[in-house]
């Protein structure tokens, strides 16, 4: 029996990860809030069907970069983005890009659960309705059920779909928001600290869900939890003072990072 050494297994996994195509490519991305520069020439590529974690101390630019990926920064007055970001081969900052369509392709789950003040059913069906993804009530019903199943919530709410989404627990509300995001069949899902307001049990459910969603979606997650980044991601990018310090396979980042700043942050020497 040919038993591969641990080093050989690690090398094989690295080679396999390196063959995964890029879904989004960021070239020399800088962000300005008025005269203040928040990101400095970031070059970061996001691999398809992979969970990429963005880590770093508060104010380092990780959430700012995340918001550039679906142009959420457009909603901030005096915010300016330079450089280039492509989704497949589409330049998402090209003037011809429909931003509403872009945000259907690149969905977002925020730090605090933010269900609409509508029923559970309407929370999930809203996106497919406005984007014309369901032509009949039967098709809409199917999208709602499938999305809630993907979010691991269907069995908990299937008998109360007309109750308000705001009546769910915090963890359930966050999974409802994930169901709402996947209902429009995005290609990428962005998550900005999706578990920071949740208890450990709800966090575990969301993390399990992230593992399952990776089969069908590309996921980028901002997290302050090193343990969470290590558990859920395959790639990790470290930000500091608006700069991308390094990006690599998660296992390598947490065991043998290339930059001392990454080592210091992971070890809790600053944060």
UniProtKB/Swiss-Prot annotation:
ATP binds at residues 56-63. CDD domains: ABC_PstB_phosphate_transporter (cd03260). GO terms for biological process: phosphate ion transmembrane transport. GO terms for molecular function: ATP binding; ATP hydrolysis activity; ATPase-coupled phosphate ion transmembrane transporter activity. The keyword Phosphoprotein does not apply. This is Phosphate import ATP-binding protein PstB. GO terms for cellular component: plasma membrane. Part of the ABC transporter complex PstSACB involved in phosphate import. Responsible for energy coupling to the transport system.
